[in-house]
Amino acid sequence: TPKYLNSPESSIFEKGKLLFAFDKAYKSIREEKQAILVEGYMDVISAHNHGVTNVVASLGTAYTRDHGHILMRQAEEIVLAYDMDGAGRQAAARAIELLQNTDFKVRVLAMPDGKDPDDYVRNHGGQAFKELVAKAVKPLDYLLSESLIKHDTNDTEGKQAVMADVFPYIANIDSQTQRDDALKTLALPLWLDNSTIFRYFRDYVKKGQIELVD
């Protein structure tokens, strides 16, 4: 059973061009210069009921560039607070991709214990949720932590898998300085020196694949 049921799309109702509760949230978003983007209606309703009013939802669909256009005049920062199930993780990864190299500051909130924002707010309250949002991390840190959970970096295959997960994001960073900094960040948990990670990255950009030597 789908978690969120929406009306069929039409010329009037286009999910990719609407943000649930934006009419109620935009003043808070403007004041705080931050929009918290969640997946579902109940996430928004619970947050607003507990005093966190800069929260909007993408109506059960992934983030789109049209959503960004809606938020552009109100927010400087977008915090992604999607569910931590498979669909939520995929939606977060897609949103990170679309938000990369935009004017928004972007952070990602990994909900603890697999809970969604609705569960968390109802159990812990609005202030606790705000404190959690304050700890949201940069997209690179989120993608890296997600990958490190899945792969054992003590062996070559694990290192290669982590690089395969994170290199596409780094390759799309416009700034050379930021790209170099991202590679240095990636090198640390892989126990690689900077020159090695740079070489693997150059090979990835040139060949589209990663070839590691034990």
Model-derived regions, located:
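Phosphate-handling DNA/RNA-contact segment within nucleic-acid enzymes
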Residues: 1-74, 78, 91-92
